[in-house]
Structure formats: structure tokens, C-alpha cells
A protein has these predicted regions:
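Intrinsic low-complexity, intrinsically disordered segments enriched in polar/basic residues
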Residues: 1-10, 16, 118, 151-152
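Helix-boundary and loop/linker segments of multi-pass membrane transporters
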Residues: 2-7, 40-48, 77-79, 121-123
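Generic preference for well-ordered secondary structure
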Residues: 3, 11, 15, 45-49, ...
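N-terminal signal-anchor transmembrane alpha helix
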Residues: 8-33
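Transmembrane helix-loop-helix hairpins at the membrane interface
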Residues: 21-22, 26-29, 52-152
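Membrane-interface helix-loop junction between the first two transmembrane segments
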Residues: 31-43
């Protein structure tokens, strides 16, 4: 599985991993919508330039920083990459659910991808691990914004 390997270029890894994170969340969104319908009271998607920058740059930077701290803490108890990523993703799912209940469900898999990426690339250096996870997260959020804009 490419997520566990550092054999390809960082750019290729980021593009592939962001596609995996986006498609996994998107597939779950479509399934939930088809089976149950998404609620009309979803999050407000009206965006200013500041909102876009916050969604694509600031939010991912802050969340990735917090994620790295949580993963470093979890690493004190286990060295299992997927377990650590899933525990961390669960924490972020709960946090996102506080904003809107369904967000937590839709953010779990992307945060597993971000968490795995950080841990794999952290073996090069913590800075590289952070940068890769941040870029994947920023790309993921960019795709979400683009799809949201196309859907309006």
C-alpha cells in the first residue's frame, strides 16, 4: 500500500493520499445521502476569501499541528501506525462532530490518511512528516471547497 511507503516523490504521495482521503469521505457522504438523505441544516458554505484561506491553509495547519502532538503522545503507548492513526482520527471526529454531527463521520477516514502520512514521513524528519500531512489536508479541503462551489 503506497500510504506506508516513502519510495515515490513527495508530490506524488500527497496527490495520491489527498485523492484517497477525499474519495473515502466523498463516498461515505454519497452513501449516507442515498440511504438517509443529508439534513438541510448542514454547515453554512457561504465563503469569503478569509474563509477560504482559513479552510485551505490555516485550519489544516492548526489541525495538523494538533494531530502531530496527539500522535506523538499515542506513540508513547503503541508503535502501530494504523492503530495510532485511527485513535487520533476518532478524536478529531469527535471534535468535528461538535461543530456539526455528520462532520465527525465524514472526517474520520481523511484523518486516518493524514495520521498515517505523518507517521510514515516522520521517519525522514518530524518537519517532513508535518509538511506532508499538512499538504494532504490542505489539498483535501481544497477539493471539498471546489465540489461545494460546483454544487451551488
Amino acid at each position: 500500500m503506497f500510504l506506508l511507503s516513502r519510495k515515490e516523490s513527495k508530490l506524488s504521495y500527497c496527490l495520491k493520499a489527498s485523492a484517497v482521503s477525499f474519495c473515502s469521505a466523498g463516498a461515505l457522504t454519497v452513501i449516507v445521502d442515498l440511504l438517509y438523505g443529508l439534513p438541510a441544516d448542514g454547515p453554512d458554505v457561504g465563503m469569503t476569501l478569509v474563509d477560504v484561506l482559513g479552510t485551505v491553509l490555516v485550519g489544516p495547519a492548526l489541525e495538523t499541528l494538533l494531530m502531530t502532538l496527539i500522535l506523538v503522545l499515542i506513540a508513547k503507548f503503541t508503535d502501530r501506525i494504523f492503530l495510532s492513526a485511527c485513535l487520533c482520527a476518532f478524536i478529531f471526529s469527535v471534535l468535528h462532530s461538535m461543530s456539526h454531527p455528520l462532520w465527525g463521520m465524514f472526517t474520520f477516514m481523511p484523518f486516518v490518511v493524514f495520521g498515517v502520512a505523518f507517521q510514515v514521513w516522520r521517519q525522514s524528519s518530524p518537519k517532513v512528516g508535518f509538511t506532508i500531512a499538512f499538504l494532504i489536508h490542505a489539498l483535501h479541503n481544497s477539493y471539498v471547497l471546489l465540489v461545494g462551489m460546483l454544487g451551488q
